[in-house]
Amino acid sequence: MICSSQISQPMNGLKDIVETRNFKAWLLDQYGVLHDGKKPYPGAISTLKNLATAGAKIVIISNSSRRASTTMEKLKGLGFDPSFFTGAITSGELTHQSLQRRDDPWFAALGRSCIHMTWNDRGAISLEGLDLNVVEDVEEADFVLAHGTEALGHPSGCVSPRTLDELEKILEKSAARGLPMIVANPDYVTVEANVFHIMPGTLASKYEELGGEVKWMGKPHKMIYESAIAIAGVNPCESIAVGDSLHHDIKGANVSGIESIFITGGIHGNELGLTSFDETASLDSVKTLSAKHNAFPTYVLSAFKW
């Protein structure tokens, strides 16, 4: 585990690290680092190109409910050249693979009937190929599967909108029955074009408060980092993670024994007192926030820039 409270002074750009350290694999978060969900951050596309040109193996590691292929399509649509990436792994991809293979004892013991919490406005998640039966009655379910926070899936494949309060009432009934829950996106919130959205991790935290068992897929848990490093085909000591969430990206890097770069202008921007893009956070404020989350980056950078 890499968990040193010694944080370096904020850097000017990635070029400093590329020229002084020999990291073969760069594990990049997407939201808050490359883009805001709607458009790339200034300089992100050219920085990615420079990093790839320098010979880095770049792997997207994302707490997204969606499959890895969907994530790559989104990045392409935002203007990022797919050829710059070695691959991608998402929490949604891990969830899909685990439910499909069932080679882990925990997943092997699951039944086939589930309550499915998903998205509506953001686009529902397909369960095709998983041999699952979506049910609406908690009494008929074997487990709860949380891909989103906006809707409830139906046996027909359609979804109907639900409020957070309505979903939490379903969770109360599920916890009372002792159903396990799989959360396909551990993020609590995300920022999309400066608008905060509640994510499935919030439902999972509520479920744990109710006494329910939660299987957390994705960051900050080690499994997704191991998958990303395997895609790159390198050793952990040859990898560095880049992210804007202390709790997920930086904590996950600490737990996985790899170094990290904290992008301050993302999800923690307001907490750090930042008011504009590429504004530099004070080292003291970063240290205080890192201690609060018990997550310590190796390097600090205001934005993903060269």
Segments the model singles out, each with a brief description of its role:
Residues I2-Q30, H35-A54, S64-I89, E93-W306:
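Asp-based, Mg2+/Mn2+-dependent phosphohydrolase catalytic module
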